[in-house]
Amino acid sequence: MARNAEKAMTALARFRQAQLEEGKVKERRPFLASECTELPKAEKWRRQIIGEISKKVAQIQNAGLGEFRIRDLNDEINKLLREKGHWEVRIKELGGPDYGKVGPKMLDHEGKEVPGNRGYKYFGAAKDLPGVRELFEKEPLPPPRKTRAELMKAIDFEYYGYLDEDDGVIVPLEQEYEKRLRAELVEKWKAEREARLARGEKEEEEEEEEINIYAVTEEESDEEGSQEKAGEDGQQKFIAHVPVPSQQEIEEALVRRKKMELLQKYASETLQAQSEEAKRLLGY
């Protein structure tokens, strides 16, 4: 069974409506809302616009109308919404209610508005048109920024480069580079040597002789000999352990030194002599 909206669109229904309106003068809606000076008529034209919007919103739900028809319907709905806003402003000027605050906004909320697009809305199948769907897709949130404490948790020996040689890659490369660098230095030294020989220069003995870094000089042997003592048979005798004063002995020596400094500073010569005599008698 056909719906009421489809019945109203049939040819017979339109013909019957035309017969009923033959003897009547159809009043047309003013082009500008400011041309209307009566509040009841302004209310009438507003209701008429709402009815037209409702019909077009119902039509645009059909995705089989085609892209161009859907775009035209969406443009017409937005145009009627702007016109409805003009009539609401005019009604308020004529002393009527402020529909911008108290009026229903169901028709406005049926469409989605693209931010920054001057109030243009998309209704029904227009939301799924090519190029429109992407406008409503939300951008992914950026990853949360890590704090300094979280970054410090990920720092290990590898961050400081202590594990660079464990991967088995850098060591062969370093060996190859070292081998190549040594060969270059040897070739350079040979070239310089041949150039000096060609000029007739003699090489210095310091360059020919290798310095023995393990050789012990006489000065070093004298210093080391200060810790050695000769035995009865003339052989060297090494001291295995050098006595070191304990912490208590060091503290007692510091106390005695401090007492002597105080006596020299505050006591007279006679008192110091008496103190020394008393120590001698007591056997200190």
Swiss-Prot record:
Gene3D superfamilies: Helix hairpin bin
Modification N6-acetyllysine, positions: K127
Chain's role: Component of the spliceosome C complex required for the selective processing of microRNAs during embryonic stem cell differentiation. Required for the biogenesis of all miRNAs from the pri-miR-17-92 primary transcript except miR-92a. Only required for the biogenesis of miR-290 and miR-96 from the pri-miR-290-295 and pri-miR-96-183 primary transcripts, respectively. Required during the transition of embryonic stem cells (ESCs) from the naive to primed state.
UniProt main location, coarse: nucleus
Assembly with partners or alone: Identified in the spliceosome C complex. Component of the XAB2 complex, a multimeric protein complex composed of XAB2, PRPF19, AQR, ZNF830, ISY1, and PPIE. Identified in a pentameric intron-binding (IB) complex composed of AQR, XAB2, ISY1, ZNF830 and PPIE that is incorporated into the spliceosome as a preassembled complex. The IB complex does not contain PRPF19. Interacts with CPSF3; this interaction is in an RNA independent manner. Interacts with the microprocessor complex subunits DGCR8 and DROSHA; this interaction is in an RNA dependent manner.
Domain of life: Eukaryota
Keyword Phosphoprotein: yes
Composition bias type Acidic residues, residue spans: 203-225
GO CC terms of this entry: catalytic step 2 spliceosome; nucleus; post-mRNA release spliceosomal complex; post-spliceosomal complex; Prp19 complex; U2-type catalytic step 1 spliceosome
In-chain residues carrying the UniProt-annotated modification Phosphoserine: S246
Protein name according to UniProt: Pre-mRNA-splicing factor ISY1 homolog
Annotated localization: Nucleus
Annotated region (Disordered), positions in chain: 196-243
Family: Belongs to the ISY1 family.
Alphabetical list of PANTHER family matching this protein: PRE-MRNA-SPLICING FACTOR ISY1
Keywords, ordered alphabetically: Acetylation, mRNA processing, mRNA splicing, Nucleus, Phosphoprotein, Spliceosome
InterPro entries to which the protein is assigned, alphabetical: Helix_hairpin_bin_sf, Isy1, Isy1_sf
Upper taxonomic lineage: Eukaryota, Metazoa, Chordata, Craniata, Vertebrata
Keyword Acetylation in record: yes
One GO-annotated biological process of the protein: mRNA splicing, via spliceosome
Compositional bias per record (Basic and acidic residues), positions renumbered to this chain: 226-235
